[in-house]
Design a protein with these regions (language model features):
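Phosphate/oxyanion-binding loops and surfaces in catalytic or ligand/nucleic-acid-binding neighborhoods
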Residues: 109, 142-145
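Extended charged
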Residues: 1-64, 150-191
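Short Fe-S-cluster ligation motifs
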Residues: 117-140, 165-186
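Short, charged surface segments at domain edges that flank catalytic/cofactor-binding sites
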Residues: 45, 49-93, 122-129
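Short proline/glycine-enriched turn/loop motifs at strand-loop junctions of beta-rich domains
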Residues: 9-11, 84, 96
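Histidine-centered nuclease catalytic patch
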Residues: 93-135, 150-152, 157-159
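Cys/His-coordinated zinc-binding microdomains
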Residues: 93, 140-143
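The −1 position to Zn-ligating cysteines in a subset of zinc-ribbon hairpins
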Residues: 88, 102, 138
């Protein structure tokens, strides 16, 4: 289902576009948005180009663009804590108690509702935007920093969701620091 929403100063342009929107099968709902079902990627792409040309906002409404209300409880049912009642932030590795965890969508809901290529990719890998494989633990700062960005955040989230990664990283850092201290003490003792 494709929804074309009328917003602010673009209202006049949308009023002038009503004929074209009705011709392709969209109808005005009680909220002032044009809604309807479109079949096929070609028809959706054509509508997307038309909306961009006329400066209309639009949103693709499907299972990949809707945030469920229970995704936080789904996350805690399917993901065990790393230590006791603590989770790792998938982006920075900070240990967080369960009540401080912000459950984040690895692939953002907003991007999934607008991007057809991302929707196609998600259909191959996960069952929906609220699938447990798309949910990760994050601290509030990292979640706000990420926003709707993808790119490096996706890579960091996929690697950082595993507790062993942070344990290995911290062990390596500790070993490196211990090695540097040992080397410094040895150099002082040799003199």
């Amino acid at each position: 289902m494709i929804q074309v929403r009328v917003s602010g100063t673009k209202y006049r342009k949308a009023r002038r576009s009503w004929f074209h929107l009705r011709r392709i099968g969209l109808r005005k709902d009680r909220y002032g948005a044009y809604t309807g079902e479109l079949k096929g990627r070609r028809q959706v792409e054509k509508l997307k180009r038309y909306c961009e040309k006329k400066r209309l906002s639009f949103r693709i409404d499907n299972e990949y663009g809707r945030r469920g209300g229970s995704y936080r409880s789904i996350f805690f049912q399917t993901h065990a804590p790393a230590f006791g009642n603590y989770y790792f932030c998938a982006y920075c590795g900070r240990l967080l108690p369960k009540d401080r965890v912000t459950v984040d969508h690895l692939y953002p809901v907003g991007s999934a509702s607008r991007d057809l290529k991302l929707q196609k990719k998600l259909k191959r890998h996960i069952r929906g935007i609220n699938d447990p494989d798309n949910l990760i633990a994050a601290c509030r700062a990292c979640n706000q920093k990420k926003g709707t960005e993808m790119g490096r955040w996706i890579r960091r989230g996929k690697i950082g969701r595993h507790a062993w990664y942070w344990e290995l990283r911290w062990s390596f850092r500790f070993a490196l620091a211990a090695g540097v201290i040992f080397l410094a003490v040895w150099l002082i003792a040799v003199r």
